[in-house]
């Protein structure tokens, strides 16, 4: 699994887009239009972008996604997914 953890303005998105392209992965993000524009600016084509909402609907309806997945800003995705239920205040993660 790839983890891109870095500060602002450090090309995290372009690196994640390259990973998505190389792994034929769906790029899950909050704003697909903005990411499509960025991908074109980076010269990256052939990436399927899916919003958090679309991704959740596919998982809910099909129970799976038959492609690899990368998620831009995992914390935002978690907040989007669970925020109506409760307030997300922390998590842990293991280094690999």
Regions found by a protein language model. Give the residues of each.
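Short, flexible beta-strand-to-coil junctions
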Residues: 30-32, 93-96
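Conserved RecA-like ASCE ATPase "motif II neighborhood" in helicase/translocase motors
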Residues: 45-89, 96
């Amino acid at each position: 699994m790839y983890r891109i953890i870095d500060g602002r303005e450090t090309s995290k998105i372009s690196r994640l887009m390259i990973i998505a392209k190389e792994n034929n992965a769906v790029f899950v993000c909050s704003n697909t239009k903005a990411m499509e524009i960025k991908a074109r600016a980076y010269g990256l084509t052939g990436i399927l972008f899916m919003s958090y909402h679309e991704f959740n609907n596919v998982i809910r309806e099909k129970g799976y996604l038959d492609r690899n997945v990368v998620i831009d800003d995992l914390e935002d995705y978690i907040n989007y997914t669970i925020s109506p239920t409760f307030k997300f205040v922390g998590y842990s993660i293991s280094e690999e």
